[in-house]
């Protein structure tokens, strides 16, 4: 069984999905599963994902019956994930090749969430401010975040314990179609 499930919601991202998948399959830590969630786009994203799935059996593709939008697409991926830890990757992003390995190095049985830094890519790698420079308990983490200026809360850039994430999803009313932005902050 994989230790980390990488959830890749997919909706009209044919321009980016190959790079995202390459960054997953080439992780230095190999004990992963990659779940591509087809959210009913109308481009070639899923055809591209299927080509990768033929070559790598760690890739699973699930198909939503209708466009569920990002939050619910992520939830569908989490529900089928086999690993105890979940990492969300937006299809237009990619992981450094040692991202999972670095997370695993600091995992222990009490780890509920690991946050890591990101880069904005223009013509050069321009790092976003280092938000996470220490280890925090949940009780100390949220007060720390509240004090940060300009903190962008995203589901990506974090490794979540699956059971805690499922609990958070169950607290939400995912049938509320009015959730169309900032859904990352709800998790």
PLM segments and residue spans:
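Conserved donor NDP-sugar-binding/catalytic core segment of glycosyltransferases
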Residues: 98-129
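Short beta-strand/loop segment that forms part of the nucleotide-sugar
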Residues: 31-40, 60-64, 90-91
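Glycine-rich, basic loop-to-helix element that forms the pyrophosphate-binding segment
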Residues: 64-81
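A conserved acidic beta->alpha catalytic loop
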Residues: 23, 38-47, 66
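Short aromatic/hydrophobic "clamp" motif used to bind/position activated sugar donors
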Residues: 86
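Conserved nucleotide-sugar donor-binding catalytic segment
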Residues: 142-187
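Short, well-formed alpha-helical segments that are part of the catalytic scaffolds
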Residues: 12-26
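Acidic helix N-cap motif at the loop->helix transition within catalytic regions
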Residues: 18, 43-52, 94, 98
């Amino acid at each position: 069984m994989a230790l980390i499930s990488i959830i890749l919601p997919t909706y009209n991202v044919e321009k980016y999905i190959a790079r995202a998948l390459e960054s997953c399959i080439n992780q230095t830590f190999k004990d992963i599963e990659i779940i591509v969630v087809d959210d009913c786009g109308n481009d070639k994203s899923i055809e591209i994902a299927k080509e990768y799935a033929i070559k790598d059996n760690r890739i699973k593709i699930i198909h939503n019956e209708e466009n569920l939008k990002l939050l619910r697409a992520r939830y569908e991926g989490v529900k089928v994930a086999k690993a105890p830890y979940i990492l969300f990757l937006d299809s237009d992003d990619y992981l450094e090749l040692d991202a999972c390995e670095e997370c695993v190095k600091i995992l222990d049985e009490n780890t509920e969430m690991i946050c890591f830094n990101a880069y904005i890519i223009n013509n050069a790698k321009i790092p976003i401010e280092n938000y996470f420079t220490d280890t925090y308990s949940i009780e100390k983490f949220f007060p720390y975040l509240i004090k940060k200026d300009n903190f962008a809360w995203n589901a990506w850039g974090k490794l979540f314990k699956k059971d805690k994430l499922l609990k958070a999803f169950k607290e939400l009313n995912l049938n509320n179609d009015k959730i169309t932005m900032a859904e990352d902050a709800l998790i």
